[in-house]
Amino acid sequence: MTKSINRRSFVKSATIIGAAVSIMPSNLFASSNKLQIGVIGTGLRGQWMTKLFLNRKDVDIPVICDIDDRMIDMVLKVFEKQNRPIPKIYNNGPEDFRNMLAKEDLDGVYIATPWEWHHPMCISAMENNIHVGTEVPAALTVNECWDLVDTSERTGSFCMIMENVNYRRDIMAVLNMVRDGLFGELIHCQGGYQHDLRHVKFNDGKGPYGGGVEFGEKGFSEARWRTQHSVDRNADLYPTHGLGPISPMLNINRGNRMMHLTSTSSQSRGLNKYIIDNGGTSHPNAKIKFKLGDIVTTVIKCANGQTIMLSLSLIHISEPTRPLYISYAVF
């Protein structure tokens, strides 16, 4: 006897929500059996992903959650443009996402919020038997990482980092070459992320991407929260951009694992210089001391002997005409 399957049991049997959403044919589900995806965080990244979700006819977004009414207004225009029903809105304070996850019948939730909220939102979703796709990073501490793993294993809910670099065509091509043995035994891999983000971290408080040197409460969009990490932390803030593609090539967590690392940064100069160059020495932000060094270099030792070197620069690169540069090498 053939056993019928509904949307929820189908998603639970899939490897990850992202795969189910991106590769299944659009006519797989009946109109009453569409995947129900909630969105937490409707900023510029959330708006872009909402558009991609709504491009699929087998996906509905019945609910969204955000505390910024400006961003909610912007994402609602995406629904209107695509002639989709206006979603239910949860915007009653920073903890209202818990109400959404507890009350709504969702197959999955996509999270694009300030980084410190990723972990509690992922945990809350999985506790409510909802699969999760979260923007990077999924966690800020080792304990939070293990918390995500333990909760996923206990609840049976998937938790996926939406590391888009892993799915670049060139990256996947090299991964296939590695698995086919084209390069022989790998001994060392390098990953780098060089992206001048100063125009993202500072703006005029009215729009994104430059035009001023404000951040925090006076900033707009990502500058409201993202820049503070550069004030408080000295670290590789984007390890998965470099490490994500390398990990499957070295079979990390598939018979190999990372054992220990050393990480060193240069002095911090670029952020302060940007403020002075664009706001003057008299601007209050010119006096702020940033902990994040301009260049961060990390070397990782693996259990099977390989080494990994990661390089991060969110300030400047050698070619000013190329504001984003992601490089990889395998040896």
List where the protein language model places each region.
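Short beta->alpha connector loops at strand-helix junctions that form conserved
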Residues: 135-137, 163
